[in-house]
């Protein structure tokens, strides 16, 4: 078991946005969003665990997670998007998936523990453009 800062991000009304701009426009929007987020992730020393219409990330230090969140909010606003971010520090277990499973599409690392759903719920409480930290 280890302690880390867990970060969940979510783009507000992403489904409506995709309906409005279409699949091709959405593909470009996601590419821009993902590039900005991953650049910030690298600069702040985090790890990408999963991606949907947002990210699930871990950081060794809460300060690094907070710096990521500030940059992420600025980047999404610059892209004309509204994001909510939740950060929670807690104990988790990191489990490596077998290489054969990763080759079939599994994530390389799974994060287990109560801190994970707690962090997701913190994010769900945030409004667009807001970051909450517990």
Place the predicted regions along the sequence by residue.
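Catalytic NTP-binding/metal-coordinating core of nucleotidyl cyclase/transferase enzymes
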Residues: 1-70, 75
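Catalytic beta-strand-to-alpha-helix segment of the class III nucleotidyl cyclase homology domain
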Residues: 35-38, 42, 54-134
